[in-house]
């Protein structure tokens, strides 16, 4: 086999590979003879079909099957011999004639080689959130609202009321698609509608009609409506007032708590602290990763981005439970490209840093992280034992330990400031971020 390496710009290069004719023809001949012994053909007994007839009728097909098997073997050997780190590959067949060498080009996309420097340029705003009894009481109040019962009342609309409404949304005086609905239930203050919509209903009475003006958010999914000033003609058809359950032993049992109200409040606080810790870690880590992407200079392999896009589509399909009749491949790659590119770039940067630094996940550190994570489950010890039996889960934990160490290492060199934030705003932002990332 003859291999010619043609270097191209950046992370691209090509291998021109030539396989001797006798090697190809020999394999094809053997496959034709093997086929002749098993194929059924009119006029011949099984195993007695002449190889010449098989070649005449199926020779081209057999040759292509042989080549399809042989090409990956040859370019894999060439890649190994040339010590190339390949991210993606496309094969272009050049010459394929009996009695002549097989020639093909393997167009390669390589993993970029780069070194990350300038960590001091990274700016991180570290959120500081105080979790007090006030936030715990508010969380319990939110849980009470989840179990609220509603009864119709004759009064003006107030916060926390459930209202049944009709509405027609208009942009530039014309009704826009998706902006009209009838008999929609809205809980005032829940945030289920765009900002300003629910506030505009406060003070209305049953049977009242009103036109409000609201501006759609900048990041609204429908780009035609993003930042657009619109009007909504609203009719209130029913007003219901919420009645919240008392916080007593019966109420806390709905959450699987057996130790009474005091135990319930303690568990709520512990859960809030645990969730807050992981969210704040994530917020800091996201800023660190964003900063790393800004200072690192390299070309991102498109094949890796495409692979990540395909994985995101399959993950979406899985989240939808396989959704019958839904073809995820009909979704445009553009919907996933930005997130996919970020993930690929972050992964390449972290790998580059880890290759130059010696970060290790000690067994005790993995155990400690596991202990912390399983506290969110009803049966922590049982969950812990199940995870410890799963090699993939343990590998993920080790990777997370190393990722945390790397993040701390970058933070030691970065510009870090602190900013006080509200607990519930942090939770809300986290939910929005998760939804934006599918």
From Swiss-Prot:
The PPIase FKBP-type domain, residue ranges: 160-245
Family statement: Belongs to the FKBP-type PPIase family. Tig subfamily.
Statement: the UniProt record of this protein carries the keyword Secreted: no
A GO BP annotation: chaperone-mediated protein folding
Cellular component terms per the entry's GO annotation: cytoplasm
A molecular-function term among this protein's GO annotations: protein folding chaperone
Primary location: cytoplasm
Origin: domain of life: Bacteria
Enzyme superclass (EC): isomerase
Subcellular location: Cytoplasm
Domain notes: Consists of 3 domains; the N-terminus binds the ribosome, the middle domain has PPIase activity, while the C-terminus has intrinsic chaperone activity on its own.
Function: Involved in protein export. Acts as a chaperone by maintaining the newly synthesized protein in an open conformation. Functions as a peptidyl-prolyl cis-trans isomerase.
Disulfide bonds: none
PANTHER family in alphabetical order: TRIGGER FACTOR CHAPERONE AND PEPTIDYL-PROLYL CIS/TRANS ISOMERASE (PTHR30560), TRIGGER FACTOR-LIKE PROTEIN TIG, CHLOROPLASTIC (PTHR30560:SF3)
SUPFAM superfamilies: FKBP-like, Triger factor/SurA peptide-binding domain-like, Trigger factor ribosome-binding domain
Gene label: tig
Keyword Hydrolase: no
Annotated protein name in UniProt: Trigger factor
Species of the source: Francisella tularensis subsp. tularensis (strain SCHU S4 / Schu 4)
InterPro entries: PPIase_dom_sf (IPR046357), PPIase_FKBP_dom (IPR001179), Trig_fac (IPR005215), Trigger_fac_C (IPR008880), Trigger_fac_C_sf (IPR037041), Trigger_fac_ribosome-bd_bac (IPR008881), Trigger_fac_ribosome-bd_sf (IPR036611), Trigger_fact/SurA_dom_sf (IPR027304)
Keywords: Cell cycle, Cell division, Chaperone, Cytoplasm, Isomerase, Rotamase
Catalysed transformations (reactions): [protein]-peptidylproline (omega=180) = [protein]-peptidylproline (omega=0)
């Amino acid at each position: 086999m003859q291999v010619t390496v043609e270097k191209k710009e950046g992370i691209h290069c090509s291998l021109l590979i030539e396989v001797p004719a006798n090697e190809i023809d020999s394999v094809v001949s053997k496959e034709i003879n093997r086929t002749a012994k098993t194929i059924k053909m009119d006029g011949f007994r099984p195993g007695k079909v002449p190889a010449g007839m098989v070649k005449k009728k199926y020779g081209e097909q057999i040759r292509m099957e042989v080549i399809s098997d042989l090409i990956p073997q040859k370019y894999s050997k060439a890649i190994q011999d040339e010590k190339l780190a390949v991210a993606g590959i496309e094969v272009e067949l050049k010459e394929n004639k009996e009695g002549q060498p097989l020639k093909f080009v393997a167009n390669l996309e390589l993993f970029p080689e780069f070194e990350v420097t300038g960590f001091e340029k990274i700016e991180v705003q570290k959120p500081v959130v105080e979790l007090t009894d006030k936030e715990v009481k508010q969380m319990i109040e939110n849980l009470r609202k989840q179990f609220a019962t509603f009864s119709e009342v004759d009064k003006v609309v107030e916060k926390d009321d459930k209202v049944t409404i009709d509405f027609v949304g208009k942009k530039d005086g014309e009704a826009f698609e998706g902006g009209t609905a009838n008999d929609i239930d809205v809980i005032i203050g829940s945030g289920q509608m765009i900002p300003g919509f629910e506030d505009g209903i406060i003070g209305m009475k049953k049977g009242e009609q009103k036109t409000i003006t609201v501006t759609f958010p900048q990041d609204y999914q429908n780009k035609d409506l993003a930042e657009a000033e619109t009007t909504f003609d609203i009719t209130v058809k029913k007003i219901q007032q919420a009645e919240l359950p008392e916080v007593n032993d019966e109420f806390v049992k709905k959450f699987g708590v057996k130790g009474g109200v005091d135990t319930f409040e303690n568990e709520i606080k512990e859960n809030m602290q645990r969730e807050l810790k992981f969210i704040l870690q994530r917020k800091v880590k996201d800023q660190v990763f964003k900063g790393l992407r800004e200072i690192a200079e390299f070309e991102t392999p498109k094949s890796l981005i495409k692979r990540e896009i395909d994985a995101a589509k399959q993950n979406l399909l899985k989240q939808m439970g396989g959704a019958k009749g839904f073809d995820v491949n009909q979704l445009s790659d553009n919907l996933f490209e930005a997130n996919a590119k970020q993930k690929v770039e972050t992964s390449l940067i972290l790998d580059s840093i880890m290759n130059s630094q010696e970060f290790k996940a000690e067994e005790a550190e993995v155990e400690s992280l596991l202990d912390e994570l399983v506290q969110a489950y009803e049966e922590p010890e049982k969950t812990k034992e199940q995870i410890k039996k799963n090699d993939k889960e343990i590998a993920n934990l080790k990777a997370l330990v190393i990722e945390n160490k790397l993040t701390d290492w970058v933070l030691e060199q970065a510009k870090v400031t602190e900013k006080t934030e509200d607990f519930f705003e942090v939770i809300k932002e986290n939910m929005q971020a998760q939804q934006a990332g599918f």
